[in-house]
A protein has these predicted regions:
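Active-site loop/helix belt of alpha/beta enzymes
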Residues: 8-9, 43-51, 55-60, 115, ...
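A charged N-terminal "starter" segment
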Residues: 1-105, 111, 163
Length: 241
């Protein structure tokens, strides 16, 4: 398969989808059946081709997808992809309309984002699912402490069309041989999730963390660079680039 990004300057990359299929299957076997595999296909699947990589991942063991922006989710829906799609980025007014219309799962972490989504839901007369992002040490977006989690939950209680179905965080340093900070982040995440309703989808581990820390797999992992064959270590899975 040859991948050319829209509006590129004619450059292309020859992608071996058999390698991606192999990697997804290998990771799927390693995780076991109790852990969902979310394939991260943001940024045109890291330059590998959004649609073919997403389809290949879903055909070989991924149960859902993650993108950075709602526009990427819309492209997947237009290509016929019906699997759950999580938007990892922050809520914007325009993006909220797309997430609601296309049935995407939107990341939220503060009252402003929840209200923006509720307004879009009300205009379209349909609900939207959300996952609550918790910043446990990465230093990007996310509710950072119990007060911010309470504020987000209060906003959700006032937004009947915005439905909380999951929560997640991201390890800042998962490939560091010293795993003490990763363990600290995980403990902080688990403490904050005690404030949330039971039965949510919880995910903390991305590629390296999911392979290195079985204790961090919870009920979902996000696989990005691993499915493209280039984690810091393939942990004996013989992943193919």
């Amino acid at each position: 398969m040859i991948s050319a990004y829209p509006d590129s300057r004619g450059t292309c990359v020859r992608v071996d989808l058999h390698a991606i299929a192999h990697n997804v299957r290998a990771i799927r076997r390693e995780l076991g059946e109790q852990v969902q595999l979310m394939a991260v296909v943001k940024a045109n699947a890291y330059g590998h081709g959004l649609i073919p990589v997403a389809q290949t991942a879903l055909q070989n063991g991924a149960s859902c997808l993650a993108v950075a922006m709602p526009e990427e989710g819309r492209r997947l829906r237009e290509a016929g992809v019906q699997a759950p799609i999580l938007v990892l980025g922050n809520v914007t007014a325009a993006g909220a309309e797309i997430s609601v219309r296309e049935g995407l799962i939107q990341t939220v972490f503060d009252p402003a984002g929840v209200r923006c989504l509720q307004n879009a839901c009300a205009r379209q007369n349909q609900p939207v699912q959300v996952h609550l992002k918790l910043d446990t040490g990465m230093g990007r977006i996310g509710a950072r402490d119990a007060d911010e989690v309470r504020a987000a939950l209060a906003a959700l209680a006032d937004a009947p069309l915005v439905r909380l179905t999951g929560a997640f965080t991201h390890f800042a340093d998962a490939d560091n041989p010293d795993d003490s900070f990763s363990r600290e982040q995980f403990a902080r995440f688990m403490r904050l999730t005690e404030m949330l309703p039971a039965g949510l989808t919880l995910h903390a581990a991305a590629s390296d963390a999911s392979l290195r820390f079985p204790w961090a797999r919870l009920n979902m992992v996000r696989e990005g660079i691993a499915i493209y064959g280039c984690p810091a270590d393939d942990y004996g899975l013989h992943l193919r680039p």
